[in-house]
Structures are given as structure tokens and as C-alpha cells.
Design a protein with these regions (language model features):
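Core catalytic lobe of class I
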Residues: 17, 22-281, 287-288, 294-297
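Single conserved hydrophobic/aromatic residue that forms the stacking wall/gate
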Residues: 1-21
Length: 297
């Protein structure tokens, strides 16, 4: 009996220590902050594609509910400048600072990013996580986009079937998810009655709250863009992290995939891009996109 009791006491002590350590991990980490009050989006900005620089968004503070974006990878794509890593990260910082400014309290931001290179390997996702923390964002989690269904059979550069220098084949990207000010996106009863409702089906919610998503990539030729993501990606983010009638922003709009998904799901959209050519492509795609009835705009 004495030995059993001692072992039991030890187990209790270990459990208590683990809980104490786990609690201390969160010391100093903010879970909410005052970021002001939500503002109304000017109606003239709703459902627009803007040719402009997202480092200086002409959008009022605290009026966007969700940002979904995939920054250009700075990987010799025709639309991208040839920036050093520090210059690229500075550019992202300035754009994301503007996104933080325009997001409403409780608003969310989803950044789709792939890590780059092999020799050396550049962990862009890690850089962005640190950057977002510095800007004041609250991190909600990470989703892995499994692209293996679209992967070819060729090997990555490196030694074949040898320990000399095997290289990993990248078949995934990250979706980094953040909130501004609070983890909860507020909604008044009157707003729900006026149509600011959830649109995600039950089965989709159960599947999409898992941290791994699997679906194929988009063909670049289909949307006239060198690095497109499929509509399914922003659609899932929009339905999970916003209500019908909410405002969705993409500061790296490209060919307009996020805006297309927003229009399909009954949200208002704003797309901003430096390229006049891609703005024209996005507008054309949106003209050809069916609109889900949006009750608030």
C-alpha cells in the first residue's frame, strides 16, 4: 500500500508540475487588446479592384473583416521585383501593417505562403509569424495545404537514392491564421437578423477545422497568372472566418481569386494590386462570376 500511495503521489506531483509549466508558457502572451471600434466601409469601396500599392491602402481604419492573401514569392516571376530577402520582408511588413490597420476588431488574416529554396532553405513562414507578432496580431494557428495530388514524379534537385545530399520535394504550403485585437468576431443579434449569417455547411465545418487541407493546385494558364491558388483555398477561409456580407480584402490580388471566392459566397470584396494588367484580368473574371445574394452591400 505504501509503494502504491507513493507512486500515486508522484504521479499527482508530476501532473501538477506539467500544468504549472504549461501555464507559465503563456506568461506575458497577450490574448486580447483594445484596438478601437469597428467602422463602416464606405460603399464606394465595396466590390472593387484597385490598381494601387498596398503599402498605402486608401481604406479607413477598422472596417475590413477578413484578409486572405498569398504574397508573391519573389522567385523570378514576371510580375515580381528582384528583391533581397531583407527587402522582401520589409515590403511584406509594410503591407501587413496596413492590413492590421484596416482590419476590424476581431478581424482575421490568412496568409498563404510556401517556404523557399534548398541550399539554403528560407523559412518564410517563420519570418512571417515573427513579423505578425511584432505588428500586434494574435496567432490562431497554422493550416497545412497538402498539394501532393498535383505533384509530379520527378525528384528534387540533389542526390538520387543516396545519403550524399537528398533534397525534400515540397508538396505543401502554409496558411498562417491571425486575429486583430480579439479571437472572437463580434456579431449583433440585429446583424444576424439582417442577413449577416454563417454560410459554411456542417460537414464542411467539421472537415475544414482540421489542420491539413488536401486539394490540387490551379493551372497558371487557366487564370493568366504565374502563381495562382485555387478558388477552393480562399473559399474555405472566407466561409470559416467571416459572415455573409462581411468585407474581404486581398492586398496582393493578382488575378482576383480571393475576390471571386468572396463574390461566390456573398461577401463584399476589395482587391488591390500593383499590376494594371492583373487588375484588368481580375475585373474580367469577376464579371464572369456568379454572385451569391449579398444583403449588406
Amino acid at each position: 500500500f505504501f509503494k502504491q500511495k507513493t507512486a500515486y503521489d508522484i504521479r499527482l506531483s508530476l501532473v501538477g508540475s506539467e500544468m504549472c509549466i504549461r501555464d507559465r508558457l503563456y506568461d506575458g502572451i497577450v490574448s486580447s487588446r483594445d484596438v478601437g471600434k469597428q467602422q463602416e466601409l464606405p460603399p464606394t469601396l465595396a466590390n472593387t479592384v484597385i490598381h494601387g500599392d498596398s503599402r498605402n491602402l486608401e481604406i479607413p481604419d477598422n472596417c475590413v473583416h477578413l484578409v486572405v492573401t498569398s504574397p508573391p514569392y519573389n522567385a523570378s516571376k514576371a510580375y515580381d521585383e528582384d528583391l533581397s530577402l531583407s527587402e522582401y520582408l520589409e515590403m511584406l511588413y509594410n503591407v501587413f501593417a496596413e492590413c492590421y490597420r484596416v482590419l476590424a476588431p476581431g478581424g482575421r488574416m490568412v496568409v498563404n505562403v510556401a517556404n523557399l529554396g534548398r541550399k539554403p532553405y528560407i523559412p518564410l513562414s517563420s519570418h512571417i509569424n515573427l513579423m505578425m507578432n511584432q505588428l500586434g496580431f494574435l496567432m490562431r494557428g497554422e493550416i497545412i495545404w497538402d498539394k501532393s495530388a498535383s505533384a509530379g514524379s520527378s525528384c528534387a534537385w540533389g542526390s538520387f537514392q543516396s545519403a550524399s545530399n537528398p533534397c525534400l520535394r515540397d508538396v505543401h504550403e502554409y496558411l498562417l491564421v491571425f486575429s486583430k485585437g480579439n479571437y472572437k468576431l463580434l456579431r449583433e443579434k440585429s446583424e444576424r437578423e439582417e442577413g449577416r449569417i454563417d454560410t459554411i455547411p456542417r460537414d464542411d465545418f467539421i472537415q475544414h477545422t482540421k489542420s491539413i487541407w488536401s486539394f490540387a493546385t490551379e493551372r497558371a494558364s487557366r487564370v493568366n497568372h504565374p502563381a495562382p491558388f485555387p478558388v477552393e483555398l480562399p473559399k474555405r477561409c472566407i466561409e470559416m472566418y467571416s459572415f455573409a456580407g462581411d468585407v474581404v480584402l486581398d492586398p496582393f490580388n493578382g488575378s482576383g481569386t480571393t475576390c471571386v471566392a468572396a463574390k461566390n459566397t456573398g461577401r463584399a470584396y476589395i482587391g488591390v494590386d500593383l499590376s494594371e494588367e492583373y487588375c484588368a484580368i481580375a475585373r474580367k473574371r469577376l464579371e464572369e462570376t456568379e454572385s451569391w445574394i449579398c444583403l449588406l452591400y
